[in-house]
C-alpha cells in the first residue's frame, strides 16, 4: 500500500515542475493510486477470508492491563466520536471530511497502558506501521475512523479502519504528524512493545526461553525499512533450525518453514511466507530480538519484539518479502 501512496506525491511533484496539475489530472492520479491500493488489498477481501484477514477485527496488545480482540460489532459500537478534518490522502486538500470512529485516547483509557509506555504502534493489514508518541495520542483527537461523511470507508479510502489526525482543529499536528503517520487498514494497536511469545508447534517460547538458545550476531543492512538506518546494523537472534529443534519440531527434507507475522499479509494462507527446508543450510535466517552494539531489545516501532532477518548472501528481489516484522509463529509443513 505505501508504495502505491508514494506514487501519487511523486507524480504531483513532477507535474508541478511543469505548470501545475489541473483538477482533471489530480483526479486521474488519485484514481490510479486508489486502484493500485485496491489491488494490493484484494488478497484480504476474498469471500472465504476470515475477519482478521479483511481488517474487521481490531486487536489491542502490548504493555496493557487489559488486552483485547474487538470484533466489528464492538468496533462499530465504540466508534461514536467525530473528527472533522482535511485529509492528507485526497487531492482536495481544502475539503473538510467528517470522520466517525474511535478516539485513540479513549481506547488507551479502556485498556490501561503501563506507566512507562511512551509510544503506540499501529500495524496495518499490509504490514505498514505507524508509531505515535502516547502524549500526543492523549492530547489530540487522533481517531481510528470507520466512516467518512456518513459512509463506510472503502478499501481504496483506507478502510475498514483508517488512522486519522486532526489537522484542521489542531493545526500543530500538521507538521508533528505528517502524512507518513496516517495509516490505512489498521488491524493492530500495539501499546509499547509486546513480550516475546513465539509459537512453534504446540509450544510457546517466552523471553527467558528464547534467551537460553544459542545466540548469533551479524552486521547487515535491514529490510524492514521504517525507522531503521540505511547503513549496516548489528542484529542478534537465533537461527531457524535452532528454534525448531528447541521445540522438538522435525525438518522434512522436502518441507518448508512458514514464518508468520502480525500483519494479515504475513499470515495469508493463500500466499504464505515460506522458506524451503533445503535452503536453511545455505541461508542462516535469524529470528532477531536485539540490535546494535548495546544489544538493545527491538521495540514495536522497529517491528519487535521478534523479526525475521534475511542473510546478506540470500537477500535479493525474491527474498525481500521475507523480511518479516512482528514474527509470532513458525510452522513446518511437508511439501505436497
Where are these regions (language model features)?
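Bacterial N-terminal signal peptides that target proteins for export
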Residues: 1-6
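C-terminal motif of bacterial Sec signal peptides marking the signal peptidase cleavage site
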Residues: 13-16
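N-terminal intrinsically disordered, low-complexity segments enriched in P/E/S/T
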Residues: 18-336
